[in-house]
């Protein structure tokens, strides 16, 4: 469907795929199952969890209350993970603000994997991407009109799923964030398939009647996904027995914690020893805004100048420090993978995508790679996943 665009995207891809063995595949599938139980519990019981743990504004709580009367349907969400120096996979964030983010861009990774497999005639690889496309095709149900409510954030994904859904016979309309309220009578009609590419700031700026219309029309994704699951403070809950004991078995909680980076909320008391140490030893920590994505606002100590790092502790006119709107994590040393791109050698770090829709997991999407330990802040390349047990094929891959 997107083969005409493939030559452009292929120029950014590593020559060697990332090989995923059956053991890694099963590890990631278990990780999804555990994560989904946490996400579902948080979404359905946030009123018991939020007080004292994840402060939300009155407007946010009002928005969530609109959605709380509906069954939880996660929509599209994407846990991302990095590869630690010891080879373990470590969750670093969950992206769930924008519909289908990473899903259709991973099509080019599928093309790249197919091209690579031509070296091995008669052999196959395992992939759930076709199942994912079938699931995405079924999402509109019987709707013939599709509306994308979109923020000013840059994304390449919309033009891809526009083509995908137009080929299914849907009329496709994009409505920018400043037109959403004025055109509510258009997109909120019964029978519309409405998806959100809005960020939290956009949504918080709308009146409650508009937000209620989004719930009534069944907009994808669920507000609980956008405001709770995407929030990096959710990661702090994974390390709290009071939370995990209500949705996970002890062995599953231990499994999740072994695959996650310890996280604390900077404005809370238990983070203060970390913050004091981070102020003096920046290279040992990374700071991330609660709700942003695409590495926006991320301050990795080793990549941040000393004066810029210290500025995060300086109070503004309202008395709040920039760091007070962030989470803090130990900076994770990562394994690098050698590659040659445009004649130059790099040691790239990997960031993997777990492609999830509702309660389903469709295995790994494309890998984002960079010679910097934080993606999206410098050079940016890609690698395709290749799932196989074949030792000869794996010998030609960078094995995860």
Question: Could you tell me what each predicted segment is?
Answer:
Residues 1-400:
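Preference for protein termini
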């Amino acid at each position: 469907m997107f083969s005409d665009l493939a030559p452009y995207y292929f120029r950014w891809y590593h020559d060697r795929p990332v090989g995923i063995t059956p053991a890694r595949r099963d590890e990631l599938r278990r990780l999804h199952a555990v994560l989904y139980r946490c996400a579902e519990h948080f979404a359905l019981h946030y009123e018991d969890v939020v007080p004292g743990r994840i402060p939300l504004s009155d407007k946010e709580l009002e928005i969530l209350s609109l959605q709380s009367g509906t069954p939880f349907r996660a929509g599209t969400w994407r846990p991302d993970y990095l590869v630690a120096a010891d080879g373990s996979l470590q969750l670093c964030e969950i992206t769930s603000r924008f519909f289908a983010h990473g899903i259709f861009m991973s099509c080019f990774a599928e093309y790249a994997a197919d091209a690579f497999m031509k070296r091995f005639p008669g052999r196959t690889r395992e992939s759930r991407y076709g199942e994912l496309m079938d699931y995405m095709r079924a999402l509109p149900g019987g709707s013939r009109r599709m509306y994308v409510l979109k923020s000013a954030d840059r994304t390449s994904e919309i033009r891809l799923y526009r083509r995908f859904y137009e080929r299914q016979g849907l009329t496709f309309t994009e409505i920018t964030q400043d037109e959403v309220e004025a055109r509510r009578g258009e997109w909120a009609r019964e029978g519309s398939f409405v998806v959100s590419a809005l960020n939290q700031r956009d949504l918080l700026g709308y009146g409650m009647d508009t937000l209620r219309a989004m719930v009534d029309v069944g907009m994808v994704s669920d507000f609980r996904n956008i405001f709770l699951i995407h929030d990096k403070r959710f990661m702090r809950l994974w390390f709290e027995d009071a939370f995990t004991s209500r949705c996970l078995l002890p062995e599953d909680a231990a499994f999740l914690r072994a695959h996650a980076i310890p996280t604390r909320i900077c404005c809370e008391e238990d983070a203060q020893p970390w913050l004091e140490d981070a102020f003096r030893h920046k290279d040992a920590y990374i700071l991330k805004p609660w709700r942003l994505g695409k590495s926006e606002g991320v301050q990795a100590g080793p990549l941040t100048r000393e004066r810029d790092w210290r500025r995060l502790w300086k109070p503004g006119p309202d008395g709040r420090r920039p760091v007070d709107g962030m989470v803090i994590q130990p900076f994770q040393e990562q394994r690098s993978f050698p590659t040659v791109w445009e004649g130059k050698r790099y040691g790239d770090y990997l960031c993997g995508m777990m492609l999830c829709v509702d309660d389903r997991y469709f295995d790994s999407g494309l890998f984002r790679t960079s010679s910097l330990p934080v993606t999206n802040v410098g050079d940016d390349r890609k690698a395709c996943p290749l799932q196989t047990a074949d030792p000869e094929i794996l010998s030609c891959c960078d094995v995860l």
